[in-house]
């Protein structure tokens, strides 16, 4: 979902060549969820939020509650912020180093809890494949990239051939690692084992480089953890993030 009914339908436009335009995509999905929740033991729903639709999350929760009824305990809402990419000029995305993003996550988590919905988040960095010698992305032309999000971006191009992938990956990591910068910037940071200096793809989006900058999220992590402790753990009595 991309918001409440109005926003979601503006962003998820029905293909007029395939579907009747009189149909409401948002309501159709809600009806499907009602049916699916009566069949399956667990359903995961993703809610993409930005600086506009975050304020309509409670309306979405009310609609979802009305749709699934007594089966709401089967629903898990995955909260994920919309971020910048090199392919768009969208101005309402969140900078993932910003404290505002941390506070918005907490607000959405609180709303989920109050409505009785389970949730998970995409706040913390996932393990990165960019400097891994055991992972790569293969495109439809047989080119090898170091990052799953980097399709067509030459800075992440490992090789134009699938021959001798191992040596190509070794050479790429040796040439493109930012270990010397991380050693200086992250030496005393308790989050280093979690983020390992941040995401190379996000560095590219923000700075145009994959090795000369650090997309540091320390202040965002500090804010999220302290806000979670005060607003969720203490006030709501919830001890963990699913």
Model-derived features: positions:
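C-terminal accessory region of radical SAM enzymes
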Residues: 94-123, 149-196
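Short, flexible helix/strand-to-coil boundary loops that buttress conserved ligand/catalytic motifs
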Residues: 12, 148, 199
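Short, charged/polar low-complexity linear motifs in solvent-exposed/disordered segments
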Residues: 62, 162-165, 205, 235
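Radical SAM enzyme core and accessory elements
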Residues: 155, 181-242
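Short glycine/proline- and charge-enriched loop/turn segments
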Residues: 13-17, 163-167, 211
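Radical SAM enzyme [4Fe-4S]-AdoMet core and its adjacent flexible, acidic
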Residues: 2, 6-133, 137-141, 160
């Amino acid at each position: 979902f991309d918001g409440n009914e109005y926003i979601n339908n503006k962003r998820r436009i029905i293909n007029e060549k395939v579907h009747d335009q009189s149909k409401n995509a948002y309501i159709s999905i809600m009806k499907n969820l009602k049916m699916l929740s009566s069949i399956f033991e667990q359903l995961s729903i993703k809610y993409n939020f930005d600086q506009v639709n975050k304020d309509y999350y409670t309306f979405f929760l009310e609609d979802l509650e009305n749709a699934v009824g007594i089966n709401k305990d089967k629903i898990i809402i995955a909260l994920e912020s919309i971020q910048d990419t090199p392919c768009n000029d969208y101005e309402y995305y969140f900078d993932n180093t910003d404290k505002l993003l941390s506070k918005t996550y907490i607000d959405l988590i609180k709303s989920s809890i109050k409505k009785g919905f389970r949730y998970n988040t995409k706040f913390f960095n996932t393990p990165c494949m960019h400097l891994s010698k055991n992972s790569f992305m293969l495109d439809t032309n047989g080119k090898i990239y170091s990052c799953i999000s980097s399709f067509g971006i030459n800075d992440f191009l490992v090789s134009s051939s699938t021959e001798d992938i191992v040596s190509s990956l070794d050479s790429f990591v040796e040439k493109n690692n930012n270990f010397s910068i991380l050693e200086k910037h992250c030496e005393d940071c308790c989050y280093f084992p979690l983020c390992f200096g941040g995401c190379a793809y996000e560095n590219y989006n923000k700075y145009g480089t994959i090795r000369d900058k650090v997309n540091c999220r320390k202040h965002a992590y500090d804010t999220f953890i302290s806000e979670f402790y005060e607003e969720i753990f203490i006030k709501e009595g919830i001890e963990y993030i699913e």
